[in-house]
Amino acid sequence: MSHRLLLIVGSGPPLMRRYLMEAAAAYSPLLLIDDAPPTWQRPYTVDHETADLTDPLAVTAAADALAARWNIAGVLTWDEYCLMAAARLAERYGLPGNVPDAVGAARDKAVSRQRFAAANVPSAASTWVHSLAAAASAAERVGYPAVLKPAAHAGSVGVVRVDALTDLPRTWAIAEAGAAHQGAEGQGVLLEEYLDGPEISVETATYRGVTTAVAVTRKSLGFKPYFMETGHCVTAGDPLLTTVAPIAEAALRALGITNGISHVEMRLTADGPRLIEVNARCGGDLIGDLVRRATGVDLARAAAAIACGHIPDLHPTEDRSAAIGMLYPPAEGIVTHRELRPGRDQHLEHFQWLRDVGDTATLTPSSTTPNNIRAGYAVVSGDSAHDAQQHLADVLARADVRVTSTVPRAA
C-alpha cells in the first residue's frame, strides 16, 4: 500500500489508445477498470477489475475493490463515455479531477450551449428536438443548412448536415439512430445552426483552473452530409493558436473544467472562431501523438500528472509538423487486395491497415461507429505543415485497396 497508483477507467481500442497507456504507465504504475480482462493492456497494469463500464454501481464497486488493495493517487480516462465515472470516482476518493457537474456539462451539448451563451462564448444556436416535426420547426427558425446531432455522443456519431426540408426525414433517422447509443449524460437530438468554415481543435491542459493552450489541430472533413474527420495536422507554433486560445480557455471556464487535458473543437467562421464542442479528455485519432511529434509536449503524460495532482510538463521541445490521414476503400464490397507500394518512407512514422483481405468494406457510416468506413491510416512528420501534408498525400497515394462487389465463393 506504500506506492500510489493511477487508476485508468476504460482503456479503449489498442490501435488508437496504446500510446496513452504507454505514456501513463511511464509516469505511474497503473490500475485498470475495463469491461474485459486485460490483454494488450497487461504490460502496463499492476492490477485490474472488470465491470460493465455503463453501470455506475459496478464501476464504483470495482474501484472500491482496487482501493482496498492499493493506494490510488488519481483517476484518469480518455474514453468519452467513461468521463462521468472517472469524475465521480475522483470525487469519491478526494482526488484531483473535475467535478461531475462540469463533466456532465461538457458531455451534454445542450447544457454546453447554455453555459457558453451565459458566458458570452461564441457558439452555435441550438435547440433540443424530440421529433421530426420539432426538428422541422427548429430548422425553420435557424435556417438551412442546419445540423442534427445526438446531444452526448462522440466521434461524429449521428452528426449530419441538413440542407433542406426535404432532407429532414432521412437525416433525422440518422441522428435518432445515433442518439440511441449516446449514454446517460444526454438525451435526444439537437438541431443546430450550421457553422461554415474550416474546422480545428485546440488541445489544452488545465491544472487547478489555469489552462494552457498547447496546440492547434487543423482538420479535414469528408463524406457529406456526414462530418467524418478524414485527417488532422498539428504544427508547432501555429500562428492561429494566439487567436483561438482565449476562446478555448473561456469555454472551459464556462463549463467549470479545472483539471485535465481537453480537446476543444471550433469552426473558423467569417465572424470569427465559434465553438462546436468541448471534450474533457485527450482527442481521438492519435491527436495526442501528433502533438508530441510536432511540439514535444506529451499530452498523455501531462494527463497522468494532472490526475495525480502534479504540475504537468508543457514545455515544447520540438518545432515540426505531424499529420494523420485516413484511407478509404474505393467502393463497397469485399476487400480482394491491399498493398502499400514502395516509396520514400523516411517521413512515415506509422502505417496501419484496418481491413484485411476478405473483410467487408463499406462507405456507409454506422450509427454506432461511423469510422467503420476506414480501411487504414498513415501518420507522417515534416518540417512544416506543407511538408507533412505532401508526405501524407504521397503515402496515401501509394496505398492500394481493391474491392469486389461479389462475395468470393467458398472453395
PLM regions and their residue ranges:
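Short, well-ordered beta-strand elements within core beta-sheets of diverse protein domains
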Residues: 160, 193, 236, 374-382
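A short, glycine/Asx- and small/polar-enriched loop/turn
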Residues: 143, 268-274, 369-372
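A conserved helix-loop-beta module that forms one wall/lid of the active-site cleft
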Residues: 92-158, 165
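Conserved ATP-binding module of the ATP-grasp superfamily
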Residues: 122-124, 145-148, 161-197, 216, ...
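ATP-binding N-terminal substructure of ATP-dependent carboxylate-amine bond-forming enzymes
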Residues: 1-102, 133, 359-360, 368-373, ...
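ATP-dependent carboxylate/phosphate-activation module, predominantly the ATP-grasp catalytic core
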Residues: 166, 192-257, 261, 268, ...
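Peripheral (often C-terminal) accessory segments that flank ATP-dependent C-N-forming ligase machineries
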Residues: 30, 118, 304-411
